[in-house]
């Protein structure tokens, strides 16, 4: 299941994407909320969402993915762990040496743009 958090007509929701169509899981499954935080925290909720997405995908209901304005998957993450120099072309472009270990660094909520 591919998930997309975004807004349609100004209303933010979690959508399950299938091809060029998406179904609104926020409306279909109680407790999901308008980002992926609840799905990450509760595996049983994710299972419910997968089941509901399959059910809704069989029906004609849905919205075009092109009509969804993407948003952050988690609207207020406490900390973001980033991976720097994570692909060879990036390393070469920057003139860096390939590291023995990945470069990890953290960002706080305030650094999200």
Could you describe each region identified by the protein language model?
Residues 1-102:
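N-terminal non-catalytic cap/leader segment that marks the start of a structured domain
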Residues 97-113:
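Structural signature of FAD isoalloxazine-binding scaffolds in flavoprotein oxidoreductases
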């Amino acid at each position: 299941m591919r998930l997309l958090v975004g807004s349609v007509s100004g209303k933010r929701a979690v959508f399950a994407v299938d091809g060029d169509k998406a179904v609104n899981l926020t409306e279909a499954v109680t407790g999901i909320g308008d980002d992926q935080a609840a799905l990450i925290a509760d595996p049983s909720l994710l299972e419910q969402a997968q089941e509901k997405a399959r059910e809704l995908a069989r029906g004609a209901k849905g919205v075009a993915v092109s009509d969804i304005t993407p948003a952050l998957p988690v609207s207020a993450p406490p900390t973001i762990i980033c991976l720097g120099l994570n692909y060879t072309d990036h390393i070469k472009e920057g003139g860096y040496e390939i590291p023995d270990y990945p470069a990890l660094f953290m960002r706080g909520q305030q650094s999200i743009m």
